């Protein structure tokens, strides 16, 4: 989809449709819709859609009045949803060229960025492998406004949304096509296009490094495991900080010997959403060029049953020397992240963020609206929460108290990989804390937010691409 800017009066914009936000309690005297406002048919409620044809005073053939809700509560996140919902509404009607009107009260650059993000995210469909002619997509999205920073804001919004959609495309790939090696190949191609360094560690390299925790997960699969490393190095680094991003890359998760139920297992191609988010974030970071170095580490494996697969009761030795009793082979994400976190620390990362579709327990706790956030450092937690708030990606801080480590006691090894029924999201984070050690670290459990089971007004069902925007913002806003 082409994104353009027009600094013209409203009546001179040529498009198939104009998108005009409307607040609750306000009447817009333009477009000949006074009767609709007076009758209450147009009330301005959030995401309410009213389509006008051949409205007076404009060249566009349609005007879409979109409810923005209460004016005092409308923010960039609201603009992102409004733009995405309007795009999805209009493209269903085969509209090809639309313009979103940013009046003076939307003059802030954050609104322009959010409008572009919403449009690109809303235009995305998980239909790559459909062969019919029924696909509908917009050709052109015009941002109509007059703020001085419009060009840079639109460019930033496009970078972030395209990176997020890149991540969504990766998650949508079926596991027979996106194997661990396939994921590495996608990362290599992206790195070459955007000027990042890319290194891929194979099984032999990981064995030499002592990554027994990661490799234990992979031994049941015919697909070889890899550790994907992406590096961004600024021309001039400010301060000593080096941000490390670690993402779970289980390209298909059967549960292993502790096998999952068949119902819904097809969705387990999305168990690499954390890794895909890190690849997407690095794509955005390469273009936005923050002042600090950023490296991403994506352990990519399949978790399969078989005659060679890891068994419940097995003991593996992680890269940092800790021994782990594998009670449940379906708690594999923490096992691969453990060695990736250790490797990131030894590579010089001073601050760490990991993202993983790690536990069903976080969905029980928070539903599908908030990412579960855990941190061993208050300042690091606050950085991530601030970035998430700015980008409209909802997160909620959960406890990480040492007392929960009691749940992970093993009679045979230093630690068990699961801690029983209660507090499962917390005990998973406590497990990872053993490998982050003293490095300031945030763990994001995205199991409830990485995937939509049905369409939203502003987003197609399937992968969401969270938390790509938060991670890019974190890097861009970093202050020593």
Swiss-Prot record:
Keyword DNA damage: no
Catalysed transformations (reactions): Release of an N-terminal amino acid, Xaa-|-Yaa-, in which Xaa is preferably Leu, but may be other amino acids including Pro although not Arg or Lys, and Yaa may be Pro. Amino acid amides and methyl esters are also readily hydrolyzed, but rates on arylamides are exceedingly low; Release of an N-terminal amino acid, preferentially leucine, but not glutamic or aspartic acids
TM stretches of this protein: none
Record's keyword terms, sorted: Aminopeptidase, Cytoplasm, Hydrolase, Manganese, Metal-binding, Protease
Pfam families, A to Z: Peptidase_M17, Peptidase_M17_N
Residues the entry annotates as binding Mn(2+) 2: 248, 253, 271, 332
Any one Gene Ontology cellular component term annotated for this protein: cytoplasm
Lineage: superkingdom: Bacteria
Location relative to the cell: Cytoplasm
SUPFAM superfamilies the record matches: Macro domain-like (SSF52949), Zn-dependent exopeptidases (SSF53187)
Active site: 260, 334
CDD domains hit by this protein: Peptidase_M17 (cd00433)
Cofactor note: Binds 2 manganese ions per subunit.
Listed EC numbers: 3.4.11.1, 3.4.11.10
InterPro entries documented for this protein: Leucine_aapep/pepB, Macro_dom-like, Peptidase_M17_C, Peptidase_M17_leu_NH2_pept, Peptidase_M17_N
Gene Ontology molecular function, alphabetical: manganese ion binding; metalloaminopeptidase activity
Protein's GO biological process: proteolysis
HAMAP family: Cytosol_peptidase_M17
Function of the molecule: Presumably involved in the processing and regular turnover of intracellular proteins. Catalyzes the removal of unsubstituted N-terminal amino acids from various peptides.
Name the UniProt record assigns to this protein: Probable cytosol aminopeptidase
Record organism: Solibacter usitatus (strain Ellin6076)
């Amino acid at each position: 989809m082409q994104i353009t800017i027009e600094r013209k009066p409203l009546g001179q914009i040529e498009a198939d449709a104009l998108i005009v936000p409307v607040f609750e309690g306000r009447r817009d005297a333009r477009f000949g819709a006074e009767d609709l406002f007076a009758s209450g048919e147009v009330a301005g409620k959030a995401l309410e859609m009213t389509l006008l044809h051949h409205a007076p005073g404009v060249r566009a053939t349609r005007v879409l009045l979109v409810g923005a809700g209460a004016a005092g509560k409308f923010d960039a996140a609201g603009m992102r949803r409004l733009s995405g919902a309007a795009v999805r509404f209009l493209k269903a009607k085969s509209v090809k060229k639309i313009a979103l009107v940013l009046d003076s009260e939307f003059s802030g650059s954050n609104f322009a960025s959010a409008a572009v993000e919403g449009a690109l995210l809303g235009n995305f469909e998980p239909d790559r492998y459909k062969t019919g002619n029924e696909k509908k997509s917009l050709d052109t999205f015009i941002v109509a406004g007059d703020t001085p920073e419009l060009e840079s804001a639109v460019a930033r919004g496009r970078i972030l949304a395209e990176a997020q959609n890149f991540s969504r495309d990766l998650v949508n790939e079926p596991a027979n096509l996106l194997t661990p090696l396939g994921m590495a190949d996608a990362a290599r191609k992206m790195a070459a296009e955007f000027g990042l360094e890319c290194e891929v560690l194979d099984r032999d390299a990981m064995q030499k490094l002592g990554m027994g925790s990661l490799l234990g997960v992979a031994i049941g699969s015919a697909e070889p495991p890899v550790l994907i490393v992406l590096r961004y190095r600024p021309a001039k680094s400010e301060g000593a900080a080096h941000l490390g991003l670690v993402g779970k890359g289980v390209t298909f998760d059967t549960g292993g010997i502790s096998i999952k139920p068949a119902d819904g297992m097809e969705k387990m191609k999305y168990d690499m959403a954390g890794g895909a988010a890190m690849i997407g974030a690095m794509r955005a970071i390469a273009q936005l060029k923050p002042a600090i170095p950023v490296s991403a580490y994506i352990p990519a494996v399949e978790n399969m049953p078989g005659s060679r697969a890891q068994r419940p009761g097995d003991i593996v030795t992680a890269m940092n020397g800790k021994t782990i009793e594998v009670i449940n082979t379906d708690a594999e994400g923490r096992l691969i992240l453990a060695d990736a976190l250790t490797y990131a620390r030894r590579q010089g990362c001073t601050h760490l963020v990991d993202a993983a579709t790690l536990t069903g327990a976080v969905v029980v706790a928070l539903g599908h609206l908030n990412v579960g956030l855990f941190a061993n450092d208050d300042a690091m937690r606050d950085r991530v929460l601030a970035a998430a708030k700015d980008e409209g990606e909802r997160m909620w801080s959960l406890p990480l108290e040492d007392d929960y480590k009691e749940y992970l006691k093993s009679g045979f090894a230093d630690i068990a990989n699961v801690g029983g029924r209660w507090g499962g999201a917390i005990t998973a984070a406590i497990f990872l804390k053993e490998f982050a050690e003293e490095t300031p670290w945030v763990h994001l459990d995205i199991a409830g937010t990485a995937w939509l089971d049905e369409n939203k007004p502003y987003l197609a069902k399937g992968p969401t691409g969270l938390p790509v925007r938060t991670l890019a913002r974190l890097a861009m806003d970093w202050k020593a």
